[in-house]
């Protein structure tokens, strides 16, 4: 199939479909490091704020670039983005969330704290997954219309998306085990003169966490409620990583039907910049491959490399328009 034919049949090259889908609750933005994920997630959140009642943008990347992008300090509590009434942002770290949970349990009573710690490190990945569960409980209680996740680079993203099923299995196992061993552990604790909350408190906490995770897991697999926007640049490694990401998302049953390709060069025809022309040729090659592979099933959005950094609310607002109105390069 020629690339001209593919382009003819291609889906609309914008993210308008995401803005129109009012049932969406969770939006993930992810890809390889350095491809413009944060700029894309900020731009998407800005566009969503025009059509949805309330939008929350969350960074789960330990590098936390949201503060840099908007030029405003964000932390682990949702804060309104300057210049917006209905857009808030927060930067969280699943690893620190589990540590806080253990410390909180320690302060309530030694036995519960140490058991939480044992649980957290007994199964690989459960520490991060439990941190994720705490975050999701917090986020769900905030009642935003739509939540956009600016995720960590690809490997972390995929681990993050597997947390619900990892945690669901682990907590189900621990809940069952806890109910059989609970009375015996309680007796043992009282023999040692241990005070603090009983094991039932801990298992009730785990159970409530499991319920949240089960619900979130169901929502993540529902294309009416969740979708993933893949971000890449027109280079071999990035395209390869995007294909891997799409395959993994499919295996997790998470909907994905949009690719944002950033940093595209559009040199003027009479440009004397040989480097620009050579690079444009390379980019055209990979954009062609991308169109051939994905244009029938994905909305492919081509975003330009601008002469200035996209930082600050005004520049992000301008840049975000290209997500809904395709960029038209100057003809001269």
UniProtKB/Swiss-Prot annotation:
Location of the protein in the cell: Cytoplasm; Endoplasmic reticulum
EC number: 3.6.-.-
Domain of life: Eukaryota
Keywords: ATP-binding, Cytoplasm, Endoplasmic reticulum, Hydrolase, Metal-binding, Nucleotide-binding, Transport, Zinc
Enzyme active site: 61
GO cellular component labels: GET complex
Annotated binding of Zn(2+), by residue: 273, 276
One of the GO BP terms on file: tail-anchored membrane protein insertion into ER membrane
Disulfide topology: none
UniProt xrefs under SUPFAM superfamilies: P-loop containing nucleoside triphosphate hydrolases
Molecular function in Gene Ontology: ATP binding; ATP hydrolysis activity; metal ion binding
Recorded family membership: Belongs to the arsA ATPase family.
Subunit (UniProt): Homodimer.
Function, as annotated: ATPase required for the post-translational delivery of tail-anchored (TA) proteins to the endoplasmic reticulum. Recognizes and selectively binds the transmembrane domain of TA proteins in the cytosol. This complex then targets to the endoplasmic reticulum by membrane-bound receptors, where the tail-anchored protein is released for insertion. This process is regulated by ATP binding and hydrolysis. ATP binding drives the homodimer towards the closed dimer state, facilitating recognition of newly synthesized TA membrane proteins. ATP hydrolysis is required for insertion.
Name this polypeptide is given: ATPase GET3
Species whose genome carries this gene: Mycosarcoma maydis (Corn smut fungus)
Gene: GET3
């Amino acid at each position: 199939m020629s690339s001209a034919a593919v382009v003819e049949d291609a889906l609309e090259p914008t993210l308008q479909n995401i803005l129109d889908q009012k049932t969406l609750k969770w939006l993930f933005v992810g890809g390889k490091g350095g491809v413009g994920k944060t700029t894309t997630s900020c731009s998407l959140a800005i566009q969503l704020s025009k059509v949805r009642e309330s939008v929350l943008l969350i960074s789960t990347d330990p590098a936390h670039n949201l503060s840099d992008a908007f030029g405003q300090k964000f932390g682990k509590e949702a804060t309104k983005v300057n210049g917006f009434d209905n857009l808030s942002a927060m930067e969280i770290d699943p690893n620190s969330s589990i540590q806080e949970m253990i410390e909180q349990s320690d302060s309530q009573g030694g036995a519960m704290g140490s058991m939480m710690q044992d649980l957290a490190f007994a199964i690989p990945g459960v520490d991060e997954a439990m941190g994720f569960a705490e975050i999701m409980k917090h986020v769900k209680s905030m009642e935003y219309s739509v939540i956009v996740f600016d995720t960590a680079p690809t490997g972390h993203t995929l681990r993050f998306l597997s947390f619900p099923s990892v945690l669901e299995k682990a907590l189900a196992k621990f809940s069952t085990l806890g109910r059989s061993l609970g009375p015996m552990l309680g007796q043992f604790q009282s023999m040692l003169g241990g005070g603090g909350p009983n094991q039932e408190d801990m298992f009730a906490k785990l159970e409530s966490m499991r319920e949240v995770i089960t619900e979130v897991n169901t929502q993540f697999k529902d294309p009416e409620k969740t979708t993933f926007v893949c971000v890449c640049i027109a280079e071999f490694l990035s395209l390869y990583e995007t294909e891997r990401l799409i395959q993994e998302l499919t295996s997790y049953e998470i909907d994905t039907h949009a690719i944002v390709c950033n940093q595209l060069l559009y040199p003027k025809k009479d440009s004397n910049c040989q480097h620009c022309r050579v690079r444009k040729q390379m980019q055209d090659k990979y954009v062609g491959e991308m169109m051939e592979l994905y244009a029938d099933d994905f909305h492919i959005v081509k975003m330009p490399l601008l002469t200035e950094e996209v930082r600050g609310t005004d520049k992000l607002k301008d840049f975000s328009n290209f997500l809904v109105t395709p960029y038209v390069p100057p003809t001269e």
